[in-house]
Amino acid sequence: QEGDYQPEIKVFELCEEIACLYTQPADWQELCRRFGIGDKLKNAVKSLSGGERQRLFIVLALIPNPELVFLDELTTGLDAKARRDVWRILSKLKEDGLTIFLTSHFMDEVEALCDEICVLRKGMAVFYGTVEQAKAQSGCEKFEDAYLRLSGEEDAA
């Protein structure tokens, strides 16, 4: 969730370094623009806000043009508008064929982005299916309530 890069490396330098490792990288400048950091290319990574760094890390994950991307707590540190913008972009990438493996503690994010979910309890999978199936199996109307019940966190809440 936090990158460790050369202290003074600039956004464009980091993106170029990643892109040069791949034969057909994505257009990282376009990705930066889409993720709202296109005007930060000459800034040092360390000077970016937490939300800007988080969006940069998503861009870095997408530069290789993957068919599958793993995103861990991808919107941590983002404000509500930035979260929605990231969701919109990722939804479009998903429509274009990108498979997203997402870990999140934000159930609204899971509901918005995930076709299938896996709920864990003490490191063990206790549910696999859709959000609607989770609500039906748990007897809850809201997905967050279903998650809490299935994960065993309901009593702790």
PLM feature spans:
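Conserved ABC ATPase "signature" region
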Residues: 16, 20-40
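Conserved ABC ATPase signature
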Residues: 44-48
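Hydrophobic anchor residue at the start of the ABC signature
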Residues: 58
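Catalytic Walker B motif of ABC-type/P-loop ATPase nucleotide-binding domains
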Residues: 69-72
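A short, surface-exposed alpha-helical micro-motif characterized by mixed small hydrophobic
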Residues: 110-112
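ABC ATPase "signature
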Residues: 128-129
